[in-house]
């Protein structure tokens, strides 16, 4: 079976591509070619935003799955519908678990939890994209499956709550140097983390699955930890003591516009969230 991955080299998608290939999928990556292609992977070097160029590149192709990992807005998916209508048996869109209702009315999150996020434009854009896709499914049979990842990490992107311009590894460097690291709130809220290899198992299971068409799924592990536990685990792995500085999430959101902490904290990581699938 053939799959076209739009993107395919990011934190989440790299392990999905590897597992799909391992299970016998013929994989093509459509991206701008800035990273080396894994062995055995086909490549279409193009900018997905150049609709005419992409249409020419796939003119003679048909895919069992189109996997969209870099779609963010309603306009992005409208373009994809034009490109891939009648070109694929399944279109899988990566949304976000941050789209679920905020503030939370129940810490237990399922796929039927309403999609409302007044704090983060990123999440609202994902919600609008989902609405466009589900409308296309209902009106024209566009074969969409929606996947909502939660906080996903891997060996190159360790899980932290907030960081500055130097990224996630800045936090690990501060721990190694004995410097304080910020933990939002009192660090007691529960959080679900998922390794990208675990995410890949769930994702590949949805590929070419006819029961997944027209449905949304979040893919997470069933283990939850407090932010204090998460940071302590990182410090223990580094062999260093944790020098935690607890700062109220509302204060961080108010005074840290440069880093968009309002969106990431109030719109996602401030509250306890336990993802559970039906």
Residue ranges and their predicted role:
Residues 3-23:
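N-terminal Rossmann NAD(P)H-binding glycine-rich loop of SDR-like oxidoreductase domains
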Residues 37-50, 70-72:
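Rossmann-fold cofactor-recognition segment
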Residues 61-108, 117, 124-135:
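NAD(P)-cofactor binding segment of oxidoreductase domains
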Residues 107-111, 115-131, 151, 161-169, ...:
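Short-chain dehydrogenase/reductase
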Residues 131-160:
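Conserved beta-loop-beta element that borders a ligand/cofactor-binding pocket
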Residues 163-171, 184-207, 214-215:
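Substrate-positioning beta->alpha
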Residues 205-267:
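Mid/C-terminal beta-alpha module of Rossmann-like enzyme folds, strongest
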Residues 272-278:
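Conserved small/polar residues in nucleotide/adenosyl-binding loops
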